C-alpha cells in the first residue's frame, strides 16, 4: 500500500486486504513530524496493538506521569485511551545517516474500555489542551476561564471531585481530567 497514512481509510484497507483480520496491529518507523496525528488516528481506529519508533523526547512525553516536566496533553490524551510503555531507546548511530535525535520504541495497548468514548475524544483533547495552555494557572482559575462559571460553582465541583483548587494541570491524573471534563460539559 502506498499513500498518505493520515488520509488512508485504515478499516477499509484492512477489510479489503488479503489478510482481512479482526485483530490487526499498527507497527512502524514513522515520520517524526507527524507522530501525534498518527497516534491519534491509530487510537481512533482501535487496533489490538500499536508499536512505533518515535523521537525519544516524544516517547517520554507520551509515557510521562503527573508532576513530571514532560507531562502534558499528549500524555493525558494517550493514557485515557491506551496503556502506554516506552520499551527501549535507539541511539542515533543505529541509523545511516544518523539523525540528530535519539529514538525510542513505544507500545500502546488500546484499553478495552477507554476512559473517554471515541466520539468524545476530540472534545476531551480540546479541554485538556485548554487546561495545559494555561499551565501556570491553578485549575480553579483555568476552569473558571474555560467554562465561564462562577468561582463558587467551580470550587464546589473541585471539592466534589476531590481536586485541590490550587492544583495545576500538570499534577492531575488522566482520570481526574476525565471527571473535570465531564463536569464542564
Language-model segments: residues:
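An accessory alpha-helical subdomain
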Residues: 104, 108-110, 116-154, 161-164, ...
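Secondary-structure transition/capping residues
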Residues: 49, 70-73, 150, 154, ...
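Catalytic cores of RNA-modifying enzymes
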Residues: 1-122, 126-129, 159, 179, ...
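Alpha-helix boundary/capping detector
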Residues: 88, 153-154, 165, 169, ...
Amino acid at each position: 500500500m502506498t499513500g498518505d497514512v493520515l488520509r488512508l481509510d485504515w478499516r477499509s484497507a484492512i477489510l479489503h486486504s488479503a489478510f482481512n483480520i479482526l485483530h490487526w496491529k499498527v507497527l512502524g518507523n514513522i515520520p517524526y513530524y507527524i507522530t501525534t496525528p498518527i497516534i491519534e488516528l491509530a487510537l481512533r481506529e482501535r487496533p489490538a496493538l500499536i508499536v512505533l519508533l518515535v523521537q525519544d523526547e516524544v516517547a517520554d512525553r507520551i509515557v510521562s506521569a503527573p508532576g513530571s516536566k514532560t507531562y502534558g496533553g499528549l500524555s493525558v490524551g494517550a493514557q485515557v485511551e491506551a496503556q502506554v510503555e516506552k520499551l527501549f531507546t535507539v541511539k542515533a548511530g543505529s541509523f545511516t545517516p544518523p539523525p540528530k535525535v535519539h529514538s525510542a520504541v513505544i507500545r500502546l495497548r488500546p484499553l478495552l474500555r477507554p476512559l473517554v468514548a471515541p466520539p468524545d475524544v476530540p472534545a476531551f483533547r480540546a479541554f485538556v489542551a485548554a487546561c495545559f495552555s494555561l499551565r501556570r494557572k491553578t485549575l480553579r482559575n483555568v476552569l473558571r476561564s474555560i467554562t465561564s462559571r462562577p468561582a463558587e460553582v467551580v470550587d464546589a465541583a473541585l471539592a466534589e471531585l476531590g481536586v485541590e483548587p490550587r492544583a495545576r494541570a500538570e499534577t492531575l491524573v488522566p482520570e481526574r481530567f476525565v471527571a473535570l471534563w465531564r463536569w464542564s460539559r
